[in-house]
From Swiss-Prot:
GO biological process: response to hydroperoxide
A GO CC annotation given for this chain: cytosol
Protein name per the record: UPF0246 protein YPO0462/y3714/YP_3720
Family assignment from sequence similarity: Belongs to the UPF0246 family.
Superkingdom, natural source: Bacteria
């Protein structure tokens, strides 16, 4: 099984590292091309394009100008330890063992607007470039056009390497749009997480993001390799609901949190 997740806007380049192992991103030539486009933007243009404050735009203009592709542990950090949003709060990679990192390196991929597809231990320098950004480029009007089939091709290679054809989609819709399901040489399974609110079960964004991280951790720490094992997921009160589930959509429910 290969898991895909979204990246995070919040980054952490300060905390102690849980592993010294690292790898290099496989699509850095593409990242370099995007960086060169982004370096042409003024902070005001970045603010408008990304819908962020002037202060954040200034920070990201500086990141674009400082980015250089000779990544080392001194100037970059492993992606799984650099991202710090809700998904990564659920995953808690800082508590992984070396065996967990090894399993994750084979079975987990992070989608990225700048890096395309990252393995957990791939070094990355800080950036902000969400997949939905309408950044004009030689291939079209946005990043979906820029990446085209390339991310899907990388996923197919990863599926082949890890020995089966099951892709677990734990990414957001914005990021999964960068994958072409018709061109995937595998079958998709999408876990869905419903939380109770006032007696009704629905997707609550904050909880759902964290649950995607919890599911990733459950698969990695238990070294799961078969989709039927996913129904045992029970972290933080979630339970599988067979009645609401289908072959390619597994539904997990949780009682209201107090």
């Amino acid at each position: 099984m290969l898991i895909i997740i979204s990246p995070a806007k919040t980054l952490d380049y300060q905390s102690p590292l849980a592993t010294t192992k690292f790898s290099q991103p496989e699509m850095l030539d593409k990242s370099q091309a995007l960086i060169e486009i982004c370096r042409e933007l003024t902070p005001a243009q970045i603010s408008s394009l990304m819908g962020i404050s002037d202060k954040l735009a200034g920070l990201n203009a500086a990141r674009f100008s400082e980015w250089q592709p000779d990544f080392t542990p001194a100037n970059a950090r492993q992606a799984i330890l650099a991202f710090k949003g809700d998904v990564y709060t659920g995953m808690q990679a800082e508590s992984f063992s070396e065996a967990d990192f090894d399993f994750a390196q084979q079975h987990l991929r992070m989608l990225s607007g700048l890096y395309g597809l990252l393995r957990p231990l791939d070094l990355m320098q800080p950036y902000r470039l969400e997949m939905g950004t309408k950044l004009a480029n030689p291939r079209g009007k946005d990043l979906y056009a820029f990446w085209g089939d390339q991310i899907t091709e990388k996923l197919n290679q990863a599926l082949e390497l890890q020995g089966d054809n099951i892709l677990i989609n734990l990414a957001s819709d914005e990021y999964f749009k960068a994958v072409k399901p018709a061109k995937l040489s595998g079958s998709l399974i999408k876990p869905v997480f419903l939380d109770e609110k006032n007696g009704k079960y629905k997707i609550i964004s904050f909880y759902a993001k964290k649950a995607r991280g919890l599911m990733s951790r459950f698969i990695i720490q238990n070294k799961l390799t078969k989709p039927e094992q996913l129904v045992d997921f029970n972290l933080e009160g979630y339970e599988f609901d067979a009645g609401l589930s289908a072959k390619n959509e597994l539904v997990f429910k949780r009682a209201e949190q107090h």
